[in-house]
């Protein structure tokens, strides 16, 4: 079992934001968040059920905020003070079950990960929010010889739809966003030859 507690204070943390400039044009610019802070707790555990089977469990929690983040040059001026930092869910965890055959020729792994809701933009607008979600992955690897192996896998087995990135646009220009999504469910077989 490993556990850790952390505290970070940032000064002039850089953020890229699309804003309306003083000339009225739309532009992506880099700004410095005056002050921001993050506290976090991590727990990592590994438990051997048998000589061949292990369970891993990891947990993470965080509390983040921009203590001072004002952009007076934007039109209209922007104030993100008090907002949650990007990509910082309050809690997240993953659990995995791994078992190995007696002769070490095959490995079965089942894993599940979960994240609370979080924002992908310092504005914390709804358009940039990712709802809480969980992802399940399964894989089975078979070693036929030292040179040949086969892997059967399923990633995102429950076909969860979740965003990996959001580009938000300035409110005077409609305030919408462009979403980028993770891969859907993937099922496949890989055969590998080592030379």
What is each PLM-predicted segment?
Residues 16, 72, 166-168:
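Short, glycine/charged-enriched secondary-structure capping and boundary segments
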Residues 37, 89-91, 132, 146, ...:
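Residue-level preference for beta-strand/loop junctions
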Residues 92-99, 136-140, 189-191:
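Feature captures outer-membrane beta-barrel proteins of Gram-negative bacteria and organelles
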Residues 125-127, 168:
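Short glycine-enriched, charge-decorated loop/helix-capping segments at active-site entrances
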């Amino acid at each position: 079992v490993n556990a850790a507690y952390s505290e970070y204070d940032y000064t002039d943390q850089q953020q890229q934001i699309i804003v309306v400039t003083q000339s009225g044009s739309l532009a992506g610019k880099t700004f410095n968040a005056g002050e921001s802070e993050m506290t976090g707790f991590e727990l990592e555990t590994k438990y051997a059920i048998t000589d061949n089977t292990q369970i891993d469990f990891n947990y993470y929690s965080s509390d983040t905020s921009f203590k001072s983040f004002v952009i007076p040059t934007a039109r209209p001026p922007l104030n993100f003070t008090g907002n949650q930092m990007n990509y910082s869910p309050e809690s997240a965890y993953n659990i995995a079950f791994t078992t190995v055959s007696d002769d070490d020729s095959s490995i079965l792994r089942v894993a599940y990960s979960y994240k609370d809701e979080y924002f992908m933009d310092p504005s914390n607008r709804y358009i940039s929010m990712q709802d809480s979600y969980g992802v399940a992955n399964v894989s089975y690897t078979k070693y036929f010889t030292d040179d040949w192996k086969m892997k059967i896998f399923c990633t995102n087995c429950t076909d969860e739809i979740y965003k990996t990135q959001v580009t938000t646009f300035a409110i005077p220009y409609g305030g919408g966003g462009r979403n980028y999504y993770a891969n859907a469910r993937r099922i496949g077989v890989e055969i590998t030859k080592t030379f």
